Amino acid sequence: MYRRDFAGNDPIGRDQFVDIINEYGLKVRLKVRKPRTTDSTHGLPTFPNIVKGFIPTAPNQLWVSDITYITIWLDEYTYIFCYLSLILDAYTEEIIGWSIGPTLETTYPVEALRMALTRIEGMSNINLIHHSDRGCQYASSEYVILLQEHGIRISMTETGDPKDNAQAERINNTMKNELLKGMRFTNIDDVRAAVGRAIYFYNNERPHMSIDMKTPAEAALCVGEIPKCWISYRENAIRANQTALDIPEKTLPLCIGQGAHSGLRPIVNP
């Protein structure tokens, strides 16, 4: 192609041609195939979706979980994947459990769950729901038994619609396309270190429109429905249904400790 269109009587060799392509940014970017992280054809027992109309009003009422992949480059053209398991508190938007693994084995989601469970150690009267897709990891006996041993109710998506687990899907997107954007990893240890830093930033420094521009760490000090600068599709649908049924509005949050809204007292809307 180069010889035909540009070289005339001055052809170049392969290596020089590659150097020119690289110098001017003309190399075609290798398209990474996306692995499938959810296998819902496993035949294991699943659970119904019990959070369709539920909006949490305090921490540790609803946890949402999902798994996503991160690419590891072995050389310029060869890559493998590792897998990030996340658990998010749906009220605070805080990542409370995570694990990185080289495979999709249940071991790694269980590690993330065990990390999250430290948040409720010693607490009584837990009224907590764990929501996930119907993947084999979340339906496995090891994962299900661990939830049941801690008195946590289990909810799973009933279709393949991403909106059924939209909050967990959204944090996956934030992690990969914002917090880790532009990073190129060559080993799993580098991934683990970068994810740890990203999660600390996400939880403690990054304000969220969905929790009134608080950080998740600040939202964890609140009780009651937090005002939102942005409302998800799911929550809009729930609110529309509540309005149609004439369900009263909830109280504003009580937030404890330091933060932009510390000391706010609950006010019942007229």
What is the predicted function of each stretch?
Residues 80, 98-123, 139:
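Active-site beta-loop-alpha junctions of metal-dependent nucleic acid enzymes
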Residues 10, 123-126:
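Short helix-terminating capping/connector loops at secondary-structure junctions
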Residues 52, 56-96, 102:
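An active-site-proximal beta-strand-loop segment
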Residues 37-41, 132-134, 140-144, 154-176, ...:
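RNase H-like two-metal-ion nuclease catalytic core shared by retroviral integrases
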Residues 1, 17, 21, 51, ...:
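Mobile genetic element proteins and their domesticated derivatives, centered on retroelements
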Residues 1-59, 161, 215-226:
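Basic, flexible linker segments flanking DNA-binding modules
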Residues 13, 47, 84, 105, ...:
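Hydrophobic (often cysteine-bearing) scaffold residues that line and stabilize catalytic clefts
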Residues 148-152, 174-270:
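C-terminal domain-tail junction helix/linker
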